[in-house]
Amino acid sequence: MSEALSDEALLELAEHIAVRRENDVISTQAVGELTVNATLSGVIGLIEFLRNDPNCRFSTLIDITAVDNPARPARFDVVYHLLSMYQNQRIRVKVQVREDELVPSLIGVFPGANWYEREVFDLFGILFSGHSDLRRILTDYGFRGHPLRKDFPTTGYVEVRWSDIEKRVVYEPVNLVQEYRQFDFLSPWEGAKYVLPGDEKAPEAKK
């Protein structure tokens, strides 16, 4: 494996990608690793180019994840991480998605995207068009909501338990064993008030 690309080489690679895929690339940023902000309609073609282009060769899909920004009209960032073992370099491709938009599936380019897209759907509720098996993968089939959204309550909506009487899993309203506490607030910083060994010498040194 070769050494990682220098910052200058990253800038050259960013320019190469932006020129060759000008209709798909919105902007690039090269700080240690390369980040490409892409259009939703062009993200699949861009990633296919990153895999096949001899100057890129990002042949390994590391991960697909998402970030929730509720205050933004395009609420979600869908983030793709790829690796070029030929250049010892990673790249991050980001695309902004509204809550009512479909993201094209990457399975046709990287079949391993199957489980990553199911995870993003399960945890964020983002839908992928062209995915033949978009089911939950981490939470239960009857789970309500998507737990990595910023508006998902910390207590959840329901709790699950096994009923010996009904001989099945049942869903019930959340029943907290202690009074509910609201943690959504800012606490003022208060420094430590204890005295560590040796601290008593500090006033003496000032005399």
UniProtKB/Swiss-Prot annotation:
GO terms for molecular function: NADH dehydrogenase (ubiquinone) activity; NADH:ubiquinone reductase (non-electrogenic) activity; quinone binding. It is a peripheral membrane protein. Its main location: membrane. Signal peptide: none annotated. Gene3D superfamilies: NADH:ubiquinone oxidoreductase, 30kDa subunit. Keywords: Cell inner membrane, Cell membrane, Membrane, NAD, Quinone, Translocase, Transport, Ubiquinone. Belongs to the complex I 30 kDa subunit family. NDH-1 shuttles electrons from NADH, via FMN and iron-sulfur (Fe-S) centers, to quinones in the respiratory chain. The immediate electron acceptor for the enzyme in this species is believed to be ubiquinone. Couples the redox reaction to proton translocation (for every two electrons transferred, four hydrogen ions are translocated across the cytoplasmic membrane), and thus conserves the redox energy in a proton gradient. This is NADH-quinone oxidoreductase chain 5. It comes from Paracoccus denitrificans. The lineage of its organism: Bacteria, Pseudomonadati, Pseudomonadota, Alphaproteobacteria, Rhodobacterales. The gene is nqo5.
